[in-house]
Amino acid sequence: MVLALAGCSTGDTGDATPGAAAEPADEASGPAATPSVEASAGGGGGDYDIAFVQGVAGDEFYITMQCGIEEAAAELGVTVSTQGAQEFDPTLQTPIVDSVVAAAPDALLIAPTDVTAMRRPIQAAIDAGIEVVLVDTTLEDPSGVVSQIASDNIGGGAAAFDAIESANPDGGKVLVIGVEPGISTTDARAEGFEAAVAENPAFTSLGVQYSQNQPARAAEIVTGALQADPDIVGIFAANLFAAEGAATGIRQAGVEGITVVGFDAGPAQVEALQAGTVQALVAQEPANIGRQGVEQAIAQLNGEETEPEIQTGFTIITAENVDTPEGQEAAYRAEC
């Protein structure tokens, strides 16, 4: 069964989080640039240049978003350049944004890596006359941006609990593997999950533990939690790397019968689902987020009406639908 949570055009994107966030930064890590896409003729784009700054380079969520951006750019006749730091960290993302501001594109699509730390560099872009669209993650103060486009992350967290609840009708203990505090999207997913747990007295939440976006750390958390509390019936991994690590932790613990629901649907997560280590994946719509980001930027540049907040939906991928056209379409891409 494919369960799609419908997106709505005026949702609260303040609840968004990274498609996948990355581990704390090494100052030596630099940006990974992707060649510009010289878009073919299209309608409504003019000769605009759009910069896309990913949350982190090499992450299938942001790669899939980049694909959507490039597809929209080709259709609308604009040029797109993509950059991203090697780790999900504002100290690495800030100099990339500073360099983008110096290059003076017409618009900037960006997934902020921190709700407060990225406000200053993004404000600098706004002050320079660059139209800014926030994609995936957001800011504590998003004033001055054209639009915020993100998944309904609170709803996605609740949907993750629904999957665990359905597999464990008698209830039990559940655990959340988050990324780190202060990331808008993953915080919202945990919030939605915890709120849903609280509505069913048969379940007890063991709270949120943070993996710092490191699969190895997520594996350690899961292995340790299962050793300390064998009554755990379900684990919610709040992003791609947490899900990858949770699957590893389950294997290392040698425990069966645990329902693991992962957020995001990269190749490793799909393989874990097919192997039976993970029972469900909450797949976002990163390509759709990217396409809508381009559309909102161009609308603003053309003096047309824009939407300040847009929420996109989800598809729940399970063993039953992973090999169907719907399941394959929902899985993330490793390249465009």
Regions found by a protein language model. Name each.
Residues 3-7:
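C-terminal motif of bacterial Sec signal peptides marking the signal peptidase cleavage site
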Residues 8-336:
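A residue-level marker of the well-folded mature domains of exported/periplasmic proteins
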